[in-house]
Amino acid sequence: MQLNEPAPTPTLARSLGEPAHVSGWAIRLAKVIGAGDRFAEWLLKAAVERGATHYRRDFDPSLPPDNPAISDEEIGVALCLGHQPYHLDNVRAAAQLLSSPRVDAARLCRLAVRERCEPVLLHIAAVAERIAPALEPWAYLRQHLPPRPVPRADALPHWTRLVSHTAVTAQGG
């Protein structure tokens, strides 16, 4: 007998070699929004609408609208949760959204610890240090977020996938 079930989508935590922490906070947030099992898709849509424009695409119009009661910090952290599907665009969109001057670095730091996504945010902060060392909230996170190593940090985006490359064109300029 052969089972032809699709393979489950790997999670971000599994790709990092960690057990996935299933966030009760994120489950409640998905219910409040009305996104259900499409929470990750809604998060990306909300991040794009709030400024992560590099990841603009056509989203399903049946997704719930953005909810201004949910902060940029919450959307960014939720995109980096270990139980989310392993889609690096989520991490990249979180990096762009959280680079906004609207972000409260101390609040972001508290959320990151509570939701166990310190390795992802510290990876982004390390990339920011190479390009713009004083850029907030990343400078704050490097100083205040406790490090938590993961077995496979190579699963996170290469630094070149987290920065804008100016003066680079398809014609090689």
Go through the PLM ranges and name each one.
Residues M1-R28:
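Basic, Lys/Arg-rich alpha-helical nucleic-acid-recognition elements, primarily the DNA-binding modules
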Residues L29-L98:
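Helix-turn-helix/homeodomain-like alpha-helical modules used for DNA recognition
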Residues E5, T9, V22, V32-D37, ...:
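Intrinsic-disorder-associated interaction segments
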Residues I75-G173:
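Hydrophobic alpha-helical interaction segments
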Residues A20, I27, D37-F39, H54, ...:
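Polar low-complexity intrinsically disordered regions enriched in Ser/Thr and small residues
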